[in-house]
């Protein structure tokens, strides 16, 4: 959701990002996903060269900065993640980036894992935020 909204800001005014797969941070460090969840060949097919990943348009930070530099409207972001989600740390990194940029975003976290129970609780909250 984040990548799509930042790639097409003329189409999306905001996005709801629940347990976002912001795995680029771990891939850039190690060249692979934690626990080898994704074969290295697939990582390269999806993300390209891990050494260039953080500087590429696969990185939502790059997309955000590009929109800001071009003085284009930047979609708002609702970001929510469970504190037991295996993607929690990656979401923290992106949240910290958004804070530093003083972005239009709303962040929530709470008990939960990467599953429908968490998403079912936070999707209505995200919709309420997006429809304000």
Where are the model-predicted features located?
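Non-catalytic cap/lid and distal C-terminal segments of serine-dependent acyl enzymes
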Residues: 1-132
């Amino acid at each position: 959701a984040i990548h799509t909204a930042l790639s097409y800001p003329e189409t999306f005014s905001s996005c709801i990002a629940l347990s976002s797969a912001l795995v680029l941070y771990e891939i850039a460090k190690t060249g692979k996903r934690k626990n080898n969840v994704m074969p290295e060949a697939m990582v390269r097919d999806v993300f390209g060269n891990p050494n260039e990943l953080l500087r590429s348009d696969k990185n939502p930070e790059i997309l955000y900065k590009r929109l800001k530099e071009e003085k284009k409207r930047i979609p708002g972001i609702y970001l929510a993640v469970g504190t037991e989600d295996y993607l929690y740390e990656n979401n923290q990194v992106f949240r910290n980036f958004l804070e530093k940029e003083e972005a239009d975003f709303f962040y929530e976290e709470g008990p939960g894992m990467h599953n429908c129970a968490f998403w079912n609780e936070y999707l209505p909250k995200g919709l309420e935020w997006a429809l304000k």
